[in-house]
Structures are given as C-alpha cells and as structure tokens.
Amino acid sequence: IHLTPTMGALHAGHLKLVKESKKLKSIVVVSIFVNPTQFGPKEDYKDYPRTLKNDLKVLKKYGADIVFTPIQKQILSHKTKHNCPQFAIEKRLCGKSRPNYFPGVKNIVLKLFDIVQPDAAFFGEKDYQQYLVIKKMTESLKLNTRIICVKTVRDRNGLPLSSRNSYLSGQEFKIAIKINKLLKKLPPLIRTKLKINKILNHTKKVLIDHGVDKIDYLTVLNDDLSVRKKISDKSRIFIAAKIGNTRLIDNIKI
C-alpha cells in the first residue's frame, strides 16, 4: 500500500507523486484533507482551494485505487498509540514564522499512517522541510513506512507548482517567476565561495526591488537542514517569500 497525503486542489505536482506510486505496482491510496491544525490564526484555511469533485475525476484518470476523504471530526478524533516527537529542524525555516505548521502536519500524517498502514508514503521535494520532518518522525517512532521524496514539478517558467499559485494575480505571477530565475543564478556564485551572506543579501534586495513584498528567509543549509560549515553538493538554497497575501516556498540543490 502506497499513500500520497494531499489537501486537494490537485495539480501536476500531486499527480507526479501518484504516478511514482503507481510505478511500484502497489495499491495507490490518495488522501484529501484540508488540515485545520497546520494553519495559523491569520492564515488561509478558509480560503484554501477546495476542488473535490474535479480531484476525484483526475485521480480516477490517473489510476488511484482508493481516495480517502475523511471528515474533519473523524480524523481529528482518531487516537494513535504514539505521541508525535519534536525535532530541532521544525524550528528552522518555515517553523520560525509558522509555529503551528509542523505540529499540525505531523499530527494528521501520523493519524493517516495509522489508518492506512502504508508501506510507503510520497512527498514532494518543494516541501523539503516537511519531507524531512515526516521522515524523522517515522524513523523515531519506528514506523514501517518508507518516506519517498519526489522531484519538484515546475511550470514552463520554472515556478514550482503549488495550489496557492491560484491566489496570484497576473502581475503577482510575473513577480513570482522572477524568484526562480534569481534562485537559479545563485548556485554557481555560491560555489565560488565568495561571501555567501553578501550574495544572499544582495539577492533579497533585488527581489524586493522586483516587487516581492517580504522575504521570510533566503538561506543556504545542508540537506539535513543543519547549519553549513562549508558548501558541498549536499547544500541547498531555501527561500520563502510573500507576494501580496501569497506565501511561496522553493528550494534547489547547489
């Protein structure tokens, strides 16, 4: 049994996870649940796109065997025998500005694992920190579920696919494209071992000048999210930025 947990509003990134799951000749389960516990009080829970009818149609076409759409009361009241451990990496990157996010994600994913009992679960590289947190949780609790990370799917402009991209106006979309274009220029600069903080600070300024409203973070870490001592092929660039009311994240390997 292979599980792809989603919040619905499916796009080609989600469907890549389903395709990868399908390749492994398993029972393909996709869950759709907009998890209220991972949203902060001023975040977009109420506005998050809900397109269940279309999602079901698309998943049928892509060969999902089971679509699990629990009602909120059912899943929130489900008890598991485990308590979710906490990890230092939850406090970094998205965890700094979204303190509810990882506790909420872990709580629901653990419940889904308990109900579905998957042999493997699929997560996207775009949400790299989430993938690592879930991987650490399964290892810490000794769950018999392999966590598989699937490469980020991007549109023709390089923008990583996200359900939240639908929030962007035409002008905001043009600004969002510039984030990836600038991000792609950074690895060769960083590999020269010039002053990395100077490069990142300059990039932040350029993004703000191009219309990005806020940079939540732009940083280089090792791929286990530990602080880098030196740049290597295990280093990644991570960014979170706000354009209007829309928060976008991305990461690329150096």
Predicted regions: what is each one?
Residues 1-212, 245, 252:
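Nucleotidyltransferase catalytic core that binds NTPs
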Residues 202-254:
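Phosphate/ribose-recognition catalytic cores of enzymes acting on nucleotide-derived substrates
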